[in-house]
Amino acid sequence: MKAVITVVTTLLVAVAATNEVHRSYDNDHQHQRSSSINGRQAATIDPAEATSDFWRQKAQETLKAKLQEAPVIAKAKNVIYFIGDGMSAQTIAATRMYLGNENKMLSFEQFPYLATAKTYCVNRQVADSACTATAYLSGVKTNYGMINVGPHVPRYSCTYNRTESEFLGLLKWAQEADMATAVVTNARITHATPAGAYASITNRDWEDDSYVTNAGCDATKYPDVAHQLVHGEVGKRLNVILGGGRRHFVPSTQMDDENVAGSRADGRNLINEWKEAHPNNATYVWNKSGLQSIDVTNIENVLGLFDSSHSLYNLEIDDQRLGAVKPKLTDMVDAALKMLTKDKDKGYFLFVEGAKIDMAHHDSRPRLALEETAEFSRAIELARNITALDDTLIVVSSDHGHTMTYNGYPKRGSDILGIGGYSDEDGLPYTTLSYANGEGYYLTYKEGNPAERVDFSQYDLTDHQTLYMATVPLNAESHGGEDVAVFASGPMAHIFRGNMEQNVLPDLISYAAKIGKYKENGGDGDGQPGSGSSLALCIQLMVVCGVTVLLGQLKW
């Protein structure tokens, strides 16, 4: 074994120069910046696409780049975990076109490693954000609507043994490894996805005590999500908490910072309780100026609640000219990273949700969904550009899909928000983007005659409030059951490959960061010294060296 390691080490030194570019976090190939990333622009098509040589050259360039890629085999000192809520493959593809062209790439699509994850719950084929959060954050599949409680417990139960049935995952393991931790979302911070980072509850809707007591349960024995954020094992140790949902922290008899009443029934102001629990070097902020004026050098804990409920959509912030008051997702990620990266000797774990993609799809408003996906991509680009590839693992995925399809046979350069074609049955137009179900049904078919479609060209399809075509009437469009993509970049990102169950992701992340069950041994997860891991590492390095030698022999 020593001889193998010596040979591999020698080879790695010889080829290190060829991989230097790959290991730099801001190199053009892996993380190139797009000129269209800051907003929509007209589609641009390279005239050279009309030649065969164009495509052959592009293929060869891609092959060459792939052969130059080498895995970063090292412990992930830092982890940034992004979840685009409801970000289906169709949503990603449509967002490329929204930003200018089919052959554009979102920031995370440029990551070198790609996997897919199966999203079903234990008791549902199509998942919600609660059971999926439990899977991709804590490593266990559970029942629809439940967060971090075992699937043997039924939803809404408040008679189970909490000690035997509840659990937490990645954020707890990170804290046990003395990493700084943070949760960022543009939903309510108590919503299902962010709650998966710190709470255990049998009903995702129990965001404050009023919902628990209305269900006939004792909120002192089965605490609500907001209470767990302030007083729970993981929540009380979070260094940075940014999102919406002030109402769940404020009593119904009090007004919040923007003069909106709270919804708690127990009379407790959890914002004040958080302040009391963090009397030194901590700050609470509720608007963008407060967020941007944080004294990063001296502050250790931040609680930011920027809305009574969910944050506004990006386009709503722009329309209402609230950019100076309401932070967008990229603003929050930037602020969180400034807090987390100030101690160069300490690792961190940042969990980020782009929540409004999902909400826009539920509303059957694809322009909002695509703009939220673009903002999500911008936040990831920011994170990758200001962190080092050799010590920061970034994983990007989604919790579930949606029923939106990207369909028809529109010509290149067509507006993704426009008409995709005309039916050869009724002669009427149909949109390139449409939904299998949702409120858009009522705009798609004539009232009183569901057999006859409406001429959809009469609608302003560029208006972000316009509902798009849907086949089945629902008051809210549903989730989709397809697999979701997983993108990875940084240390040990190469283990994110192939198709897997969604609950495998926490194992991969904790293995890369050496936290949780992989903290105390060599990383095999079997409680034994890591000899198997060392052998696998040697084999991987030998493969990398062999590919590099092959690359040097090829003629380009």
Predicted features, each with a name:
Residues 8-9, 13-74:
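N-terminal secretory/membrane-targeting segments
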Residues 33, 43-60, 72-77, 87-92, ...:
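A post-motif C-terminal structural segment
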Residues 181-184:
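Short hydrophobic alpha-helical runs that function as membrane-insertion/retention elements
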